[in-house]
């Protein structure tokens, strides 16, 4: 038994040759099996030759930070709100605020913080191609903003009075500023400041003011805009009758300016305060208004006289769709320096007269109504006429000549003074008056002579 064990040990100690290996290995004979074992050869099996070169295994370290879910924490410059937003859904909800509270919803990303939050805004005085005078916009924006602010120990005038010459674009400039600020004003006109019923205009002002206050209470900016206040509440010489409604309109505006947050309607008296509503009024001559209304504590006054740059800017907006060069616009403005801004709008409209005249001659005067109102094809369309500098200057001179005719003739004074057209019948009137006076004098003399004869007869 001992021999068999040693034999097995010898068999197990047989050296292995990897380089010179053969298909099979011989098994030594042992006493345990009784006879020597046959050599077994594996057919069709060959071991690949292994190179004598030394094998070197290289392990490359993987940089896991490139795939890190929190990589934005070290390569992005942002605030805590951005970092918390990245961790939404990755952190236990126990340590997060409820959804929708704003903590995990970023308002801006890092680029927007740099490009928008640090942006300085300038007063852009253009709106849809129309020009807004910087001084005009500054006055309105500051006045409206002041009335919505709470300034310490400062009484802000509630009313802003914009006044100036006729046709200078006061109302249109106000509308542009309102659109620029996103304000939808409550508008009134001078025709609403008079009524057949005493007290109606004053009540209407209070109603409109409270409507604007309700809009402000709902979170939208609003103001009360009154056009041509002096035409409805002012006194234009001795020919204007001063009525009770004029007095009540002035008194109502004064009361609202003194108590802007306590405006009551007739029959409705409560202590609930309303929102403060800035009031913008326009006019041509505020000296015709009641003096206590326009004092500094109640009304801030702004005289609007457009400069040459303002007139050029507004005219560029008027001719913006007509392909008129800027040099031509400047030439037109300088050619009519004493005209109002409205003059240039009328000048542009006058250019279309030729197109309308051509359409009328081609249609016929008898068919104008049918073509304009009852045509299946709709109203006629016109091609935009070509506006040249020469044509605009020609029509401008025609408008100036018409203005001069009105100033020169002054038929109204002639009508009131002579009841005749000009001096055509002046001689006839004077002759008629002298004849009538002579006849009246002779008639009086005859009556006196008759009375004298009658007295003498009685005596």
From Swiss-Prot:
UniProt KW ATP-binding keyword: yes
Keywords: ATP-binding, Chloroplast, Nucleotide-binding, Plastid, Transit peptide
A Pfam family this chain is assigned to: AAA
Gene3D superfamilies: 1.10.8.1070, P-loop containing nucleotide triphosphate hydrolases
Record flagged with keyword Protease: no
Residues that bind ATP: 164-171
GO molecular function list: ATP binding; ATP hydrolysis activity; ribulose-1,5-bisphosphate carboxylase/oxygenase activator activity
Cellular localization per UniProt: Plastid, Chloroplast stroma
One GO CC term, this protein: thylakoid
InterPro entries on file: ATPase_AAA_core, P-loop_NTPase, RCA-like, RuBisCO_activase_AAA_helical
Range of residues in the leader sequence: none
Domain of life (superkingdom): Eukaryota
Stored PANTHER family: PTHR32429, RIBULOSE BISPHOSPHATE CARBOXYLASE_OXYGENASE ACTIVASE, CHLOROPLASTIC (PTHR32429:SF29)
Function: Activation of RuBisCO (ribulose-1,5-bisphosphate carboxylase/oxygenase; EC 4.1.1.39) involves the ATP-dependent carboxylation of the epsilon-amino group of lysine leading to a carbamate structure.
Similarity remark: Belongs to the RuBisCO activase family.
Official protein name in the record: Ribulose bisphosphate carboxylase/oxygenase activase, chloroplastic
Species this protein is from: Solanum pennellii (Tomato)
Highest classification ranks of the organism: Eukaryota, Viridiplantae, Streptophyta, Embryophyta, Tracheophyta
């Amino acid at each position: 038994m001992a021999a068999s064990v040693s034999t097995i040990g010898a068999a197990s100690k047989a050296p292995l040759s990897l380089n010179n290996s053969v298909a099979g290995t011989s098994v030594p004979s042992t006493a345990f099996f009784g006879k020597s074992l046959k050599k077994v050869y594996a057919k069709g099996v060959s071991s690949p030759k292994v190179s004598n070169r030394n094998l070197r295994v290289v392990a490359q370290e993987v940089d896991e930070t490139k795939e890190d879910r929190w990589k934005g924490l070290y390569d992005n410059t942002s605030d805590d709100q951005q970092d918390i937003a990245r961790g939404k859904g990755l952190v236990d909800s126990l340590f997060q605020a409820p959804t929708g509270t704003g903590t995990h919803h970023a308002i801006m990303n890092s680029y927007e913080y740099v490009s928008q939050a640090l942006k300085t805004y300038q007063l852009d005085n253009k709106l849809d191609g129309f020009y807004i005078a910087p001084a005009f916009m500054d006055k309105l924006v500051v006045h409206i903003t002041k009335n919505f602010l709470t300034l310490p120990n400062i009484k802000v005038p509630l009313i802003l009075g914009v006044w100036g010459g006729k046709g200078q674009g006061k109302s249109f400039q106000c509308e542009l500023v309102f659109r620029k600020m996103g304000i939808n004003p409550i508008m009134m006109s001078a025709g609403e400041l008079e009524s057949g019923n005493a007290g109606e205009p004053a009540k209407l002002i209070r109603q409109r003011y409270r409507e604007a206050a309700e809009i402000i209470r709902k979170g939208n900016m609003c103001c009360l805009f009154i056009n041509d206040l002096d035409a409805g509440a002012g006194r234009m010489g001795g020919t204007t009758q001063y009525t009770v409604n004029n007095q009540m309109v002035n008194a109502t505006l004064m009361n609202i300016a003194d108590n802007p947050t306590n405006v009551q309607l007739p029959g409705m008296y409560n202590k609930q305060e309303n929102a403060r509503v800035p009031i913008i009024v326009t006019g041509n001559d505020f000296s015709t208004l009641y003096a206590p209304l326009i004092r500094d504590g109640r009304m801030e006054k702004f005289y609007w006289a457009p400069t040459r740059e303002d007139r050029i800017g507004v005219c560029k907006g008027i001719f913006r769709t007509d392909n008129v060069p800027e040099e031509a616009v400047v030439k037109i403005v300088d050619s009519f320096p004493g005209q109002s801004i409205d003059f240039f709008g009328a000048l542009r409209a006058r250019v279309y007269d030729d197109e309308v005249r051509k359409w009328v001659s081609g249609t016929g005067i008898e068919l104008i109504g049918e073509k304009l109102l009852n045509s299946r094809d709709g109203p006629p369309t016109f091609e935009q006429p070509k506006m040249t500098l020469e044509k605009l200057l020609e029509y401008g001179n025609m408008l100036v000549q018409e203005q001069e005719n009105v100033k020169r003739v002054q038929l109204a004074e002639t009508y009131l003074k002579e009841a005749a057209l000009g001096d055509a019948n002046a001689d006839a009137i004077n002759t008629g008056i002298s004849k009538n006076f002579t006849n009246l004098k002779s008639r009086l003399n005859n009556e006196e002579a008759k009375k004298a004869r009658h007295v003498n007869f009685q005596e």
